[in-house]
Amino acid sequence: YDLVDAIEGRCRPKQALVRHPQYANLFILASNKREPDKYVSPQAVRLILDNLSPRFDYILIDCPAGIEGGFHRAVASAEEAIVVTTPHISSLRDADKVISVLKSYKLKSVELVINMVRGDMIIDGEILTPKEISDILKIPLIGIVPQDDGVFLGERVAGGDAQKAFKLLAGNIARGQRRIFNVTYKYHGFFGSIRRSLKKSL
């Protein structure tokens, strides 16, 4: 079952949920597997999520890129928003447009996650710092995720920097903390300069 099955009454909303095989309290609701082009109204999505919300502490809605129908369906059902961007200028322009649209919705908060951040490039002044990005976009920073080649290749990297950053991000969301992962810590000092040189040569 998927979201459309629940909307059209072929199953109850909870029957459309798929439990994660490793985490008993994590469930996934597929959006529309069989008819991806079928129109689904924001109101219908909201009804399903309202039905499920008493069962969960958090419902995360993964929003498609761009400001199309899928974006508005997701935002219309949300109470808060997390804008995910990368430090690249084109991505920041897109994020700025998204934030402008989000302001038209009555959301409790709009916060920022910066993905694929390279600490070596920050130290060398090749990309904006997370604080500069947050200041430009005028929304608070809630987390940073460093670029991790293992994640990029689809590998499971236990104990890696990306995992540590995600744990801090989860704590910030769940407990209202503001602990931001330091992506530059490996690139300071003598050995850090060697790491930066090696990173550039790859």
Where are these regions (language model features)?
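Conserved acidic residues
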Residues: F27, D57, E79, V110, ...
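Conserved nucleotide-binding/hydrolysis micro-motifs of P-loop NTPases
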Residues: K33-E35, G66, H88-S90, V117-I122, ...
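Amphipathic alpha-helical transducer elements in NTP-driven molecular machines
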Residues: K14, P42, R46, I89-D96, ...
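Conserved C-terminal guanine-recognition region of P-loop GTPase G domains, centered on the G4
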Residues: L92-S109
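Structural beta-sheet core signal
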Residues: I61, V83, E111-I114
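P-loop/Walker-type NTP enzyme "switch/lid" segment
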Residues: Y1-P54, F152-V157
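Inter-motif core of Ras-like GTPase G domains
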Residues: N51-P54, E68-I89
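C-terminal lobe/tail of nucleotide-utilizing enzymes
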Residues: S104-L202
